[in-house]
């Protein structure tokens, strides 16, 4: 059912997303579809085109460009249109104010943040992925003490370098239950990680003694610098165990007095949106979004916003797409997200829970104002 509230004129501050791939060989079939689902199972490619989200995305992008609403027609259009023209059209139509980019999800064939800003014509700010930074420091250090010292030093100058926030993917490295660890426990596990880095030139930080210790170090520095820390929560790529990614697993960190000054930003949250909303209602330093559910759940976007707002204050809900690699994801996130938010705000007005002015103010807050204040983004 169409909404009577039009949010298209409110520019979005996308507080969690990733960069785009640089132009290469034209994408076809499975190579294109893989960006529109979280699965890495190659046998799922044939099924992605039958998801409600993918079918809706094709129709929406086709309507914008005036082509037939089919995968074949869209891929032909992509191949025939200069990449910069194609991307700018989607970002303009999506009406984005600025992008906060997690730079830890980037390959050699991706744009850097400056290049991305030039391409899309919007400010692009940096979010540091903590695990990526930790892995680099492990590879570059001789002792574990050097890793800790280097991590603290990097985070103390992060804001001066233009970094606006931090991000953890602990959910992908064993779960969100971050336990207290001693320096001695972490140092004892360091040699094995260092040997892996020496042998292969890189290391994947999954040892929880080291990760848990360094995450607490990072949170201490975030508290001092007043840097928001994003946590991947709930669903995502298929290498995360959804059972250990419930946001309630973070409670020990949230109630720790040492971290009460750290803004915790819980990303995605689906299907634990109510649990995340509960935490945002309890703790002043907890914020949430429903990115990835917006847009992947398609018609479920309204339900995601509805569940988030059952308990969470409007001032605690942020907007993000979690889009990456291809510009269609950004456009779909903006379009479907605005529709879903407008529909729940419509309902709240119709049910005499909010008045029209309150609903419009809520939309402004969720789509950009809350994030601008939290991350200290001007304008």
Regions found by a protein language model. Give the residues of each.
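Mid-to-C-terminal alpha-helical segments outside catalytic/metal-binding sites
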Residues: 1-15, 27-64, 68, 72-78, ...
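Histidine-centered catalytic micro-motifs
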Residues: 11-24, 228-234
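Conserved, mostly hydrophobic/aromatic
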Residues: 16, 99, 166, 232, ...
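Alpha-helical scaffold segments that flank or form the walls of functional sites
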Residues: 27-120, 126, 148-161
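Acidic (Asp/Glu)-rich catalytic clusters
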Residues: 89-93, 111-127, 154-162, 220-224, ...
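A gly/proline- and charged-residue-enriched helix-loop-helix capping module
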Residues: 127-149
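Divalent metal-binding pocket/active-site signature
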Residues: 161-274
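H/E-rich (His + Asp/Glu) clusters that bind or coordinate divalent metals
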Residues: 254, 258-379
């Amino acid at each position: 059912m169409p909404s009577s509230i039009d949010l298209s004129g409110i520019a979005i501050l996308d507080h969690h997303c990733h960069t785009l791939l640089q132009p290469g060989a034209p994408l076809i079939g499975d190579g294109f579809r893989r960006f529109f689902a979280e699965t890495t199972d190659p046998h799922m490619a044939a099924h992605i085109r039958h998801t409600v989200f993918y079918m809706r995305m094709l129709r929406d992008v086709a309507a914008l460009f005036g082509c037939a609403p089919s995968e074949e027609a869209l891929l032909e259009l992509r191949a025939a249109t200069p990449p910069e023209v194609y991307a700018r059209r989607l970002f303009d139509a999506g009406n984005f104010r600025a992008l906060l980019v997690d730079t830890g999800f980037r390959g050699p064939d991706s744009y850097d943040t400056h290049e991305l800003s030039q391409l899309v014509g919007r400010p692009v700010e940096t979010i540091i992925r903590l695990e990526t930074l930790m892995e680099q420091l492990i590879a570059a250090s001789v002792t574990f003490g050097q890793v800790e010292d280097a991590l603290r030093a990097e985070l103390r100058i992060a804001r001066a370098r233009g970094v606006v926030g931090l991000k953890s993917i602990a959910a992908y490295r064993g779960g969100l239950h971050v336990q207290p660890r001693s320096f001695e426990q972490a140092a004892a596990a360091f040699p094995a990680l260092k040997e892996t880095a020496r042998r292969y030139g890189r290391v994947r930080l999954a040892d929880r003694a080291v990760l848990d210790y360094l995450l607490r170090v990072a949170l201490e520095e975030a508290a001092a610098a007043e840097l928001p820390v994003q946590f991947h929560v709930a669903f995502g790529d298929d290498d995360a165990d959804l059972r250990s990614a419930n946001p309630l697993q973070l409670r020990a960190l949230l109630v720790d007095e040492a971290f009460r000054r750290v803004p915790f930003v819980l990303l995605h949250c689906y299907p634990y949106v109510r649990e995340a909303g509960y935490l945002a209602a309890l703790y002043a330093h907890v914020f949430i979004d429903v990115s990835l559910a917006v847009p992947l759940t398609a018609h479920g976007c309204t339900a995601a916003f509805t569940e988030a707002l059952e308990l969470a204050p409007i001032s605690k809900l942020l907007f993000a797409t979690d889009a990456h690699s291809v510009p269609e994801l950004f456009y779909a996130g903006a379009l479907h997200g605005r529709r879903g938010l407008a529909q729940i705000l419509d309902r709240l007005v119709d049910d005499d829970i909010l008045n029209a002015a309150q609903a419009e103010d809520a939309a402004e807050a969720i789509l950009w104002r809350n994030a601008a204040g939290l991350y200290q983004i001007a304008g």
